[in-house]
């Protein structure tokens, strides 16, 4: 498996992976809500690549995009030491070390870039993700009550952080 920076050529596979992830109910988008096309996604990848406060990595296995992690660093003096993470892994590749490999790359990049705090959110009932994040050293910081509406019902999110 190769972990590398995303390229514009990844746009189509990235959109397909996101559609699959949206169907899980654990991501921000509802199934079918994501309206991005390949050209718009290519531009978004190019913008992230050009943004020094962003870092976008993908995991590729046999020329197939199987996971990603987006790192969105604070843009101001007071929060540039902190970065928010978004992770997604193809359901067929979970439990095979894809997420761990992506996290390890982010930890290395963060230390080089002077990022000392990583944070993420996870839907409270997404126990596999919560357990993975805990295994990777993330600590529960708090609970965001009724932060999302899923199938018409309020759902809480956990805030988690890791200090480097």
Regions inferred by a protein language model and the residue ranges of each:
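Terminal substrate-recognition subdomain of acyl/acetyltransferases
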Residues: 155-164
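Conserved G/P- and acidic residue-centered "switch" motifs that form tight phosphate/ATP-binding loops
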Residues: 97
